[in-house]
Regions:
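Contiguous, well-ordered alpha-helical segments that form the cores/surfaces of helical PPI scaffolds
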Residues: 105-118, 138
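Conserved catalytic cores of very large enzyme subunits
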Residues: 1-101, 122, 126-284
Length: 291
């Protein structure tokens, strides 16, 4: 899965470093759509936490059921995964459970920013919003740690990409609750813990905000920033941004840069309907729209 990170393996074989990443991965995700829970709680913060805690436990049960289903499959269902060491630890006499037990069952989330707007009328670009955001993320982290110990399986907090879910979840939300300012007045929910794309923050400010939450995830997250196309010619500035993200302990960082090409004259830059050089409308526009 995109942005996968593997934490310590509770089922590491004797003599194998539990922090080993090779041959492991996230097995299955369940994503909790938090704005819906905030609405069900009527905007009451403590009620929201009660509902969220219940949903996290339900997510665990769903993942355990999926895990057992996967373990019941024949190695032939994905022969290349087990017989060439792509998934490490496979022992034919024990079945594919011997390999899958080293993977991670992940609990993801969608719409932190919108959830905070429902609960307190602010998102995590504010001090009050960040305080509540950290409390929410701590609950995910604590529960996954408890599940890992109790079930002797790797559970982790995952900041879901939600490429399609962010749209389908919003459509269902609007059908039920209508359009709410700063919550459902867009066509999508904000992915996981990201700063909403309409917020006017600099790349470094975005890193500052999201870096306060990435440590709560031990199964995968990403922080990315969008820059103007001219930055491609300023490697020193790009390096400064990357170094800043690393200094903030961002585990997975990406930079989005618009890239438009005229297919007639070959001019490359950032432009819209037509090439500013030759006027051709035969252009290719590339944008990274997820992350």
């Amino acid at each position: 899965m995109c942005r996968t990170v593997n934490g310590a393996d509770i089922n590491a074989e004797p003599g194998v470093n539990p922090q080993t990443k090779d041959g492991r991965g996230n097995l299955a995700p369940v994503t909790i759509i938090m704005p819906t829970l905030a609405m069900e709680a009527g905007g009451d913060i403590e009620k929201f936490f009660e509902i969220l805690d219940q949903k996290i436990h339900e997510a665990k049960e769903m993942l355990l059921e999926r895990y057992e289903f996967m373990c019941a499959q024949s190695p032939d269902s994905a022969k290349f995964m087990y017989e060439n060491g792509t998934m490490s630890g496979y022992k034919p006499e024990e079945g594919i459970r011997s390999a899958l037990k080293h993977g991670t069952l992940v609990i993801g989330q969608l719409g932190l920013a919108e959830t905070l707007q429902i609960l307190i009328g602010k998102d995590h670009t504010t001090k009050e919003g960040m305080e509540l955001a950290k409390r929410i993320e701590q609950l995910f982290k604590d529960r996954c740690a408890e599940f890992k110990k109790a079930e002797h399986l790797n559970f982790g907090v995952y900041y879901t990409p939600a490429e399609n879910l962010c749209y389908t979840a919003m459509k269902k939300f609007k059908d039920k609750y209508g359009e709410i300012e700063n919550v459902s007045d867009k066509d999508f929910f904000t992915n996981s813990i990201h700063v909403p794309v309409w917020k006017k923050v600099s790349p470094l400010e975005k890193i500052d905000i999201e870096s306060q939450l990435t440590s709560y995830s031990n199964a995968g997250c990403i922080t990315y920033v969008e820059l103007e196309s001219t930055c491609k010619n300023n490697l020193e500035a790009l390096e400064q941004i990357v170094n800043y993200a690393m200094d903030k302990d961002i585990p997975y960082f990406a930079i989005n840069v618009p890239n438009d090409t005229c297919l007639e004259c070959g001019y490359t830059d950032e432009f819209n309907d037509k090439c500013p050089i030759c006027g051709s409308e035969h252009i290719q526009q590339l944008r990274r729209v997820t992350g």
